Amino acid sequence: MSIITDVYAREVLDSRGNPTLEVEVYTESGAFGRGMVPSGASTGEHEAVELRDGDKSRYGGLGTQKAVDNVNNVIAEAIIGYDVRDQQAIDRAMIALDGTPNKGKLGANAILGVSIAVARAAADYLEVPLYSYLGGFNTKVLPTPMMNIINGGSHSDAPIAFQEFMILPVGAPTFKEALRYGAEIFHALKKILKSRGLETAVGDEGGFAPRFEGTEDGVETIIAAIEAAGYVPGKDVFIGFDCASSEFYDKERKVYDYTKFEGEGAAVRTSAEQIDYLEELVNKYPIITIEDGMDENDWDGWKALTERLGKKVQLVGDDFFVTNTDYLARGIKEGAANSILIKVNQIGTLTETFEAIEMAKEAGYTAVVSHRSGETEDSTIADIAVATNAGQIKTGSLSRTDRIAKYNQLLRIEDQLGEVAQYKGLQAFYNLKK
């Protein structure tokens, strides 16, 4: 009854209006699961391959019909007949079927769509919530959200190099209250921007993309919004960055070239100067987390940054680790970063995603479950965050339904868990000396 009888993929659109995959899995019992695949704008060079058609006459070359065909004509044939509850066996079968180290043959987008749909179908078959199916009886931790309320870098047209300015409502007693803190700060920020005559249009992840005078102007405006909403910076709410440094790192000159986004006259920093600058910001403002503060291939820089700031700030590897246990294992061994960003489409299966989270926790690294800038209404990452007790989630600002869908799912989960639910807040940063 739990045997897979049909697998079907179709091309749909993501939050940027670009094609992506939606996959459906059916079982003998009638149980059903659907998975949709996100897509990134700033991507690590070591990420699993997102298969695109390359036909410029259709969606500007971004079509996903090849990946759709791979699901319908290759993967489906391989996994029909499997028990839908055997997630690892199905994921391993798809990895073997692809046969490449980066899923470049079938496409990580094709494989991931199936992986998510299989998990959802299994949960449907067992008549349990997805988070409960994936995590078991010990599932209880609601994640502290990193809310990206200012978008810069590759996520907007704002002249700021750093890609994300985030607020983290660590002082809230519950996830529901944390979400309220964030929403109130978001609206307070909008009022401040309007009063300054700055733009209130939003970027890919729902945050504002105003033309600030620079990074510090952005941070100080966020602090003003936190205070205007009635909260205390550095107590109720902290600040975080996603620098996405690989987006403005000049490999030939080996410098961090802020002029790429901030224009003529902006800073050009060596690796050592980049670390000095980040430390200066940490000492000046209530910053608790920095993602991709160094380029993905600047291992010496990462190690130096971790040695300098790793005990008081969460240093998250995104492009640096690409949700890959090989890169994470090296980082752990060499003392680079102290946290990993978890993006399911960077690696391509739920099995490998869970392995990365487990490896991080065993090493004392935190794991931050994350969306992508090109999202869908699929809320699987909310369930993954709770299922793994990851403790942190990054899923955008307090606008755009593609972001709010994840927050609303977390509200439902918190309700369902009832008294068992725990919101860790500041305790989610267990690797810091607070």
Swiss-Prot record:
- Which BP terms does GO give this entry? glycolytic process
Broad enzyme group: lyase
Tell me the disulfide pairings in this chain: none
Q: Which domain of life is it from?
A: Bacteria
Gene3D superfamilies with a match to the protein in the record: Enolase-like C-terminal domain (3.20.20.120), Enolase-like, N-terminal domain (3.30.390.10)
**How is the co-factor bound, per the entry?**
Binds a second Mg(2+) ion via substrate during catalysis.
SMART domains the record matches: Enolase_C, Enolase_N
The pathway noted for it is: Carbohydrate degradation; glycolysis; pyruvate from D-glyceraldehyde 3-phosphate: step 4/5
Please list the residues that make up the active site: 205, 343
Q: Which SUPFAM superfamilies does the entry mention?
A: Enolase C-terminal domain-like (SSF51604), Enolase N-terminal domain-like (SSF54826)
- Could you tell me the EC number(s) of this protein? 4.2.1.11
Detail which positions bind (2R)-2-phosphoglycerate: 163, 343, 372-373, 394
Localization in the cell: Cytoplasm; Secreted; Cell surface
NCBIfam families for the chain: eno
So what family is this one in? Answer: Belongs to the enolase family.
Biological function: Catalyzes the reversible conversion of 2-phosphoglycerate (2-PG) into phosphoenolpyruvate (PEP). It is essential for the degradation of carbohydrates via glycolysis.
- What is the protein's given name? Enolase
